[in-house]
């Protein structure tokens, strides 16, 4: 009998949400995603020490300024981990721009190009890389420009429909709407504490975005992210891609039985609305208290982990 992970792969591209190379070898995903928190966790793994040492040595060759060395080594470490992962996945690696740049379009573009150059210098072409940016108005504008220059982007920390619409209209390659973090907010801020998978607010959000994109002929890939249980994952079978943490990949691989496709669109493609303006985007996003809270919290958390990573690097310089 087939297992649920194998069955899921019939309908959806499975991506590993981890920086752990051992997990890549075990579950053989198509792509992999990383973020500052995952890079920080990966940096604690003994096998990665050589990647850290290489990043530090490289940074020392680039500059004599300690602050610049820390920035350079942190960028190089993220790319070094990405390079190791790319040896194991046939598709793409997502590497994230510093979350502290989430409200600065030009700085985000510059950092993205810096990461791309590090990959290119290591022999990796742009078609194997996704640059991750937070789905702020400024991040979406940065992605729009990068896409025009042949740098594909993964827009993350996406919680509102306004964010999803703006990303599609900007022509970004891929979005990562968060499922589990939406569920977390509703459990913490409403009286309802238990949700069946089909009524899980995170699942409902991703389903609505998927239908809207297909209905209007947008090519932006929808990749559900941030799962709390396999029930959420199974309800999104058929989504373009799902990025899944190793613990849930393990649970799916160990669960027997075929699964059914839940997301699909066979209707006609409808005319697209006029592009959302900045003021419309900000107002519509602001009308969703969950999205406002979780976007801000997500940026803060990634920034904290970026700073922890920089402190760890600084101690080695």
Curated annotation (Swiss-Prot):
<dbReference type="GO" id="GO:0006098">
    <property type="term" value="P:pentose-phosphate shunt"/>
</dbReference>
<dbReference type="InterPro" id="IPR001585">
    <property type="entry name" value="TAL/FSA"/>
</dbReference>
<comment type="pathway">
    <text>Carbohydrate degradation; pentose phosphate pathway; D-glyceraldehyde 3-phosphate and beta-D-fructose 6-phosphate from D-ribose 5-phosphate and D-xylulose 5-phosphate (non-oxidative stage): step 2/3.</text>
</comment>
<keyword id="KW-0963">Cytoplasm</keyword>
<dbReference type="InterPro" id="IPR018225">
    <property type="entry name" value="Transaldolase_AS"/>
</dbReference>
<dbReference type="Pfam" id="PF00923">
    <property type="entry name" value="TAL_FSA"/>
</dbReference>
<comment type="similarity">
    <text>Belongs to the transaldolase family. Type 1 subfamily.</text>
</comment>
<keyword id="KW-0570">Pentose shunt</keyword>
<comment type="subunit">
    <text>Homodimer.</text>
</comment>
<dbReference type="InterPro" id="IPR004730">
    <property type="entry name" value="Transaldolase_1"/>
</dbReference>
<keyword id="KW-0808">Transferase</keyword>
<dbReference type="InterPro" id="IPR013785">
    <property type="entry name" value="Aldolase_TIM"/>
</dbReference>
<dbReference type="GO" id="GO:0005975">
    <property type="term" value="P:carbohydrate metabolic process"/>
</dbReference>
<comment type="function">
    <text>Transaldolase is important for the balance of metabolites in the pentose-phosphate pathway.</text>
</comment>
<protein>
    <recommendedName>
        <fullName>Transaldolase B</fullName>
        <ecNumber>2.2.1.2</ecNumber>
    </recommendedName>
</protein>
<feature type="active site" description="Schiff-base intermediate with substrate">
    <location>
        <position position="132"/>
    </location>
</feature>
<dbReference type="GO" id="GO:0005829">
    <property type="term" value="C:cytosol"/>
</dbReference>
<keyword id="KW-0704">Schiff base</keyword>
<dbReference type="GO" id="GO:0004801">
    <property type="term" value="F:transaldolase activity"/>
</dbReference>
């Amino acid at each position: 009998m087939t297992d649920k992970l194998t069955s899921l792969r019939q309908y959806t591209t499975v991506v590993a949400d981890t920086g752990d190379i051992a997990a890549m070898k075990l579950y053989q995903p198509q792509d992999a995603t990383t973020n500052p928190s995952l890079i920080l966790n990966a940096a604690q793994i003994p096998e990665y020490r050589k990647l850290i040492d290489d990043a530090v040595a490289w940074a020392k060759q680039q500059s004599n300024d300690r602050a610049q060395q820390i920035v350079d080594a942190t960028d190089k470490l993220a790319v070094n981990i990405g390079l190791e992962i790319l040896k194991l996945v046939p598709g793409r690696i997502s590497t994230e721009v510093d979350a502290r740049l989430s409200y600065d379009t030009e700085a985000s573009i510059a950092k993205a190009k810096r990461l791309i150059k590090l990959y290119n210098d290591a022999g990796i072409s742009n078609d194997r890389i996704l640059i991750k940016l937070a789905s702020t108005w400024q991040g979406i504008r940065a992605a729009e420009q990068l896409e025009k220059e042949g740098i594909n982007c993964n827009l993350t920390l996406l919680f509102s429909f306004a964010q999803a619409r703006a990303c599609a209209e900007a022509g970004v390659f891929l979005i990562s709407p968060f499922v589990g973090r939406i569920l977390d907010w509703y459990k913490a801020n409403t009286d309802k504490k238990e949700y069946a998978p089909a009524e899980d607010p995170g699942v409902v959000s991703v389903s609505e975005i998927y239908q809207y994109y297909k209905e209007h002929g947008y090519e932006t890939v929808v990749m559900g992210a941030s799962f709390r249980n396999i029930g959420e994952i199974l309800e999104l079978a058929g989504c373009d891609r799902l990025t899944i943490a190793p613990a849930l990949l393990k649970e799916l691989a160990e669960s027997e039985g075929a699964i059914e496709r839940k997301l699909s669109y066979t209707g006609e493609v409808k005319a697209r609305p006029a592009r959302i303006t900045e003021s419309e985007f900000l107002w519509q996003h602001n009308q969703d208290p969950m999205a406002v809270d979780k976007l801000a919290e997500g940026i803060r958390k990634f920034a904290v982990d970026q700073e922890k990573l920089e402190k760890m690097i600084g101690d080695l310089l």
